[in-house]
Regions:
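Active-site acidic catalytic loop and adjacent metal/ATP-binding pocket
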Residues: 23-40, 123-180
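Short pocket-lining segment of the protein kinase catalytic domain that shapes the ATP-binding cleft
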Residues: 88-96
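Active-site Asp-x-Gly
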Residues: 53, 145-148, 160-211, 221
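Short, amphipathic C-terminal "tail helix"
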Residues: 216-225
Length: 225
């Protein structure tokens, strides 16, 4: 029995909301033998880009690169399965997506969580980019280069009991200007929670007092394009 058959046989598959281009399932181990040390019993995520094996390979390759470079707060890859399509499997981050979580919370929890999201992004942006092979910074607008998430929005941030466990949908990671991620999250916070909550995200990132609004606006246009 190969790995995919083990996952089909011994894990319960529950569909998750995600990118419309991908099928995403949460896998929980149901017991009664296998799996063993090579098929972990922790919850897994199975993800497959619909009709595009290359995109599934691409995201899995990025997860492997982040694991090799010891980047924390991101999914840990388990395996890639290919046969008439492709599925990537990774260890599930505990918690729920922040877009759902925050809409159920009292304002003080929303404020605290947004500050944490800002701190998490600041941590991600501090990762070493000297050996990063994924470059998206050719345009002149990219001047302050960092390790970028590439699709940093509330639904891609995972929250567990009021703390951030990491982020998902890592297919777009790479070298960009820090304002690309700042703009993407700012747009999403405005849409989901309201403009009045932006300051707490900026405070967590420690950019509140020196935010370049003109540059942010330009990147908002780029993100929305």
């Amino acid at each position: 029995m190969h790995t995919f058959e083990i996952y089909e046989e011994y894990y319960d598959w529950a569909p998750l909301e995600g990118d419309s281009e991908a099928r995403v399932h949460l896998l929980t181990y149901g017991g009664e033998d296998p799996p063993n040390m090579y098929q972990p019993q922790e919850p897994l995520v199975a993800k497959s880009y619909i009709d595009d094996v290359r995109m599934t390979r691409r995201e899995y390759k990025r997860l492997l690169w982040m694991e090799l470079n010891k980047i924390n707060g991101v999914p840990k890859p388990v395996t890639l399965y290919e046969e008439a399509g492709a599925y990537m499997f990774y260890l599930a981050l505990p918690g729920r997506d922040a877009a759902v979580f925050l809409q159920e919370q009292l304002p003080e929890v929303v404020v605290s969580t947004l500050k944490q999201i800002g701190r998490y992004l600041s941590f991600l942006h501090k990762q070493d980019i000297s050996e990063c092979p994924f470059i998206y910074s050719e345009a002149p607008i990219h001047t302050d280069l960092v390790f970028s998430h590439g699709d940093f929005k509330l639904s891609n941030v995972i929250v567990n009991e009021n703390y951030i466990t990491g982020s998902v949908d890592m297919i777009g990671i790479g070298v960009r200007d820090r304002y690309f991620d700042l703009a993407a999250m700012a747009l999403d916070i405005e849409r989901v929670l309201g403009r009045e909550y932006l300051e707490y995200f900026y405070e967590g990132y420690r950019i509140k007092d020196h935010l370049d609004q003109e540059k942010l606006d330009k990147f908002m246009e780029l993100v929305e394009a």
